[in-house]
């Protein structure tokens, strides 16, 4: 797990992860989950071969960005990268307490069975 507690000084963070999901705990007691397929044996073209990024553009927003692997397409061919999005009720941690990462994992795993 990597838990980001506040917007970083530089707006974009990149990571190499094959977990296949990212989640964001929102202050309105919702958990936003993105699931996606990973390809450990394929090349990723992000600057450092990263598979996910978290971006904090200006203003009150955040982007969770899974990155697909490189595709070489011939004229007329089509490529795609699918993300599944879910919202789940999940109490935002009170000031001075930690996010319950086991509960987050259980929520994500519950989507896998659907």
Q: What are these language model-derived features?
A:
Residues 99-114:
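Short peripheral tails and domain-boundary helices/loops at the edges of structured domains
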Residues 1-78, 90, 95-102:
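A contiguous, surface-exposed recognition patch within enzymatic or periplasmic domains that forms
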Residues 84-86:
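Short, surface-exposed secondary-structure boundary micro-motifs
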